[in-house]
Amino acid sequence: MNKKFKKIVTEKKLTDAERIKENSNYLRGTITDDLKNEITNGFTGDNFSLIRFHGMYQQDDRDLRIERNEQKLEPRYAMMLRCRLPGGVIKAKKWLKIDYFASKYTLYGTIRLTNRQTFQFHGILKKNLKDVHKMLHSIGLDSLATANDVNRNVLCTSNPMESLIHQEAYEWARKISNFLLPHTKAYAEIWLDQKKIVTTEKEPILGKTYLPRKFKTTVVIPPYNDVDLYANDMNFVAITKNEKIIGFNILIGGGLSFIHGNKNTWPFLATEIGYISVENTLSIAKAIVTTQRDWGNRTDRANAKTRYTINNFGLNEFKKEIEKRANVNLKPVREYSFISRGDRFGWIKDINNNWSLTLFIQNGRIYDDNNKLFKSGLLKIANIHDGNFRITSNQNIIISEVSEKNKNKIEKIALSSGLINKSTNLRKNSMACVSFPTCPLAMAEAERMLSFFITQLENIMLKYGVEDEVIILRVSGCPNGCGRSLLAEIGLIGKSIGRYNLYIGGNRIGNRIPKIYKENITEQEILMHLKYLIKTWSNERKNKEDFGDFIVRKEFVKEVINPVYDFWS
């Protein structure tokens, strides 16, 4: 361990987030008191932060802020709740209750699929919070540990069951998720009215003050990188033999968030540290998490994530500590490769001779309007489907395990409701975070602007004869990384209302960070620059060269090799 760094950290004052966790009585705080408080629709003091451990964020409608302020009213507070759903798999019949709650008890009446393979409700009033938790509990779900300083929802390759390996990987995602869950009974006591039992509580893995920052985990089946593993703290890449997982390559320390103008923050790709046999999976997971728990920076949240811990102590020191704690020697990484990270749309037959239908849901927003009946269409499918829904890391949904007798029925519903539609490859490979009006951190539009922006970019691609090509395009309303723009070939990151930084030069499979090309420019200025770049790409690329690879080869931006040094240079 770097003793100099340890001394510097321990001499600094801990962040207020650490005080909140220390004093929370294992995440209870005074949340129950706030639930009884009818004077405000929000949570007060430390509870504002503590509810995140229970899977909720307090938000308000930013479109209404000025109006409500003029009326001397508090902001229209409501909660966003994120379900814990390892691997994104949910029985179709459970969707019926999810749809009902969204329609009856949320302000917006929609369901949002996320790029972490789960769903969110936006606009839940405080008075309805217990109802949503009890509804989730009734169908075997919860929202524990989907936010704040814990291991978040565990991702898993979501392409349909083409082999037994897919089911095995999903089971590992579930095991890891359950293994790393908080042990506190606070969630059940507060939201499910379970009686408190007087015991001495402990958190054997996470500790009393939990982790220094959020922590993200994936289970991956090559050659598909649909989970964007390089953006995550801890990754298990399946190595198989005779249709069975025999072990995992381990990659650690990925993450994309940074702070505008703060050169001590930077994105970083997850790094290989070795291979383990499958029986060592949970012990290695525990070792990685507890090393980050103990070594992570609790004095500066901007430098508290795993990638900064590894940078501060060195990868070799971090690796040695993992091996020591797990009592496992990491072996050399086994060969693997990736060919894509997009979803494969349409029908695919699985190993049981059933079918899976992958549907494109732009930005993951499930709603009905005059042109799209996504919400009612999925509800109709859920009513007749005996299998699962699988939410993908690209914010889409798979109707899986469809029997031959139901295939035509489901296809007719999907067609009539617009769930099966003709979209360009550009649109199908795009993504945006939620941003306005509900995200308090948003600096610029993301979800609400993306569709219109893509339409203009589609026209440019059509003009230059590349309309059928794939370009990975992503938009984030701020630099926190939720839209994973910093693993895109074209990434927009909000700077202020109507203005973005334009990043280019990522690649198709998601293992190269793009670099800033233009700063603080408008949508029209972005389109002007992209028009020139796409025209040049169309005329000068070699052998069907991908857009991001062309950008780097022609040196429109320099390749980001070590982001610690060259992300900002």
UniProtKB/Swiss-Prot annotation:
PANTHER family: SULFITE REDUCTASE [NADPH] SUBUNIT BETA, SULFITE REDUCTASE [NADPH] SUBUNIT BETA-RELATED. It comes from Buchnera aphidicola subsp. Acyrthosiphon pisum (strain Tuc7). The gene is cysI. Its EC number is 1.8.1.2. Belongs to the nitrite and sulfite reductase 4Fe-4S domain family. Component of the sulfite reductase complex that catalyzes the 6-electron reduction of sulfite to sulfide. This is one of several activities required for the biosynthesis of L-cysteine from sulfate. GO terms for biological process: cysteine biosynthetic process; hydrogen sulfide biosynthetic process; sulfate assimilation. One of its GO terms (molecular function) is sulfite reductase (ferredoxin) activity. It holds the Pfam family NIR_SIR. Binds 1 siroheme per subunit. Pathway: Sulfur metabolism; hydrogen sulfide biosynthesis; hydrogen sulfide from sulfite (NADPH route): step 1/1. Siroheme binds at C482. PROSITE patterns: NIR_SIR (PS00365). This is Sulfite reductase [NADPH] hemoprotein beta-component. Keywords: 4Fe-4S, Amino-acid biosynthesis, Cysteine biosynthesis, Heme, Iron, Iron-sulfur, Metal-binding, NADP, Oxidoreductase. Alpha(8)-beta(8). The alpha component is a flavoprotein, the beta component is a hemoprotein. HAMAP family: CysI. InterPro entries: CysI, NiRdtase/SiRdtase_haem-b_fer, Nit/Sulf_reduc_fer-like_dom_sf, NO2/SO3_Rdtase_4Fe4S_dom, NO2/SO3_Rdtase_4Fe4S_prot, NO2/SO3_Rdtase_4Fe4S_sf, NO2/SO3_Rdtase_FeS/sirohaem_BS. One of its GO terms (cellular component) is sulfite reductase complex (NADPH). The keyword Cell membrane does not apply.
